[in-house]
């Protein structure tokens, strides 16, 4: 993989222990809040628009489904260009610009009376594509030993935000109407910009100057990694099924459970919460026991099982509830593990690009799922769930050959005195098993990102000699 040298500043020393430091906690809180607010803004619309969308001029089932999923097309188009920029320039200004575009799209939707204007507004809102940039910034400000925890926390934040959005959307729409709900999305974007100020700002200097890397080369470096492509397919299938599902569910909840749109939020919340509670220990097992591949594939199989159950029994109350509960277990687990896996497997210098492609796949899935859901609205429900199950099974078959991700650890050392840091860092990086070095001259410390399985007794001794200290590795 590509090795890099980063230079960062932080407010306090970080020791080699199991706890996060203040900067890492602030980063997770701030970036998690940004993600949560943005996901709330995007997804509160999803469980209500299939019903409330009929009040717009020129609305048809297909156009309603398109309005639900079209934000995904904007995301898919702009995630990758914004990620390229974020691998070359500071990440924070790019995030601010994206959130302002998101707010503009929400305002257009709030002022719309025609379904085509809503579609345009949702497309513009989706064009504020900052998901991958936020994830890459999080990777910048967290150490490798806490990266999985941070990424899993972010994934769970996304899952919880979607869960809360599906519960809040019907309730708020009942109070504020659909245009009021769109204004809530505008407010969430503005507040998210404010949260960015509590996130530490890293100063990244890469060994391989990315300005000398063409966009085509960056793209090719990431796309040639088969396992990352399998993760792109997984997130595509996940969000295709989820967006199509929530285009279909409002009508099925009305037909099977006799619930109004406002009441449906009280069903979504406990079901999603149950899936979340069961998913958490699965995620812990994936990392602590190094069973990420097994948990990942089991979660995909669980997703399929939920859809199969819905295809067979969604016309009954028990069948509908059980099928959704099983689906949400798989959904929450996958939502949390995929970002972590991408951060572990992607080349260091192209991490934002890899996350951008993954985010594009995610939102392209949402776009296709929304359009597919609009088409399936006019079909028998058992057929709709069967189609979604078949699509997910096909994805699972392609994903099965995926290999377990690399498991790297971080070590904190004191910088030797009187060294040329550039030359010294290049010597460190030349050692097989050293993947990355992050130096903080103000604190006189550095983090080494290591693959301990590649280190030999000789390279350990050489590393100890270069650092001037005995290393417990």
Question: What is each PLM-predicted segment?
Answer:
Residues 47-62, 247-263:
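Short amphipathic helix-loop junctions that connect adjacent transmembrane helices
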Residues 77-113:
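Conserved MFS/SLC helix-loop-helix module at the cytosolic interface between two early adjacent transmembrane helices
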Residues 187-205, 395-403:
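C-terminal membrane-cytosol helix-exit motif in multi-pass small-molecule transporters
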Residues 18-24, 201-232:
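Juxtamembrane intracellular "pre-TM" segments in multi-pass secondary transporters
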Residues 154-197, 381-382:
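Helix-loop-helix hairpin linking two adjacent transmembrane segments in secondary transporters
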Residues 79-90, 278-291:
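Helix-to-loop junctions at the C-terminal end of transmembrane segments
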Residues 88-98, 287-300:
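Cytoplasmic membrane-interface "Motif A"-like loop-to-helix N-cap segments
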Residues 121-158:
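Cytoplasmic helix-loop-helix junction between adjacent transmembrane helices
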